């Protein structure tokens, strides 16, 4: 770099340090939003496929009760446990709330998806200002509208046709 062209009396090292110190100082000066005290409860309903989850989130220690059982007992599959915990992880609220849920209908994947939506909606209800943008960006507040397509008359399944013989 030709420092004489920029400023003849300023050395190259001074130019580099001045730029780096300015950018780091401005990042530190940005005020960080303080999270409010975790004293509010939230309740919401989540749906996915045929499953319906009624969820209540209360300040606590991170205990999960699903249909009267622990989360690991109700969802033995680790993928379902991770899916349900995602809203807390993305908001850095692991262990800050207890979750009580009643789930009916559907299978394990649908129930896990319904529970995740219910938890995300509850966390959104608790603190809309801080949580909504993050949850929305991650797609946790969007209801997955995909359901099983119905069987049609004359077909074996929704789209599978019986074998066709030309002659």
Curated annotation (Swiss-Prot):
GO terms for molecular function: RNA binding; structural constituent of ribosome. Gene3D superfamilies: 3.30.230.10. GO terms for biological process: translation. Keywords: Ribonucleoprotein, Ribosomal protein. Residues 1-41 are annotated as: Disordered. One of its GO terms (cellular component) is small ribosomal subunit. Belongs to the universal ribosomal protein uS9 family. This is Small ribosomal subunit protein uS9. It comes from Renibacterium salmoninarum (strain ATCC 33209 / DSM 20767 / JCM 11484 / NBRC 15589 / NCIMB 2235). The lineage of its organism: Bacteria, Bacillati, Actinomycetota, Actinomycetes, Micrococcales. The gene is rpsI.
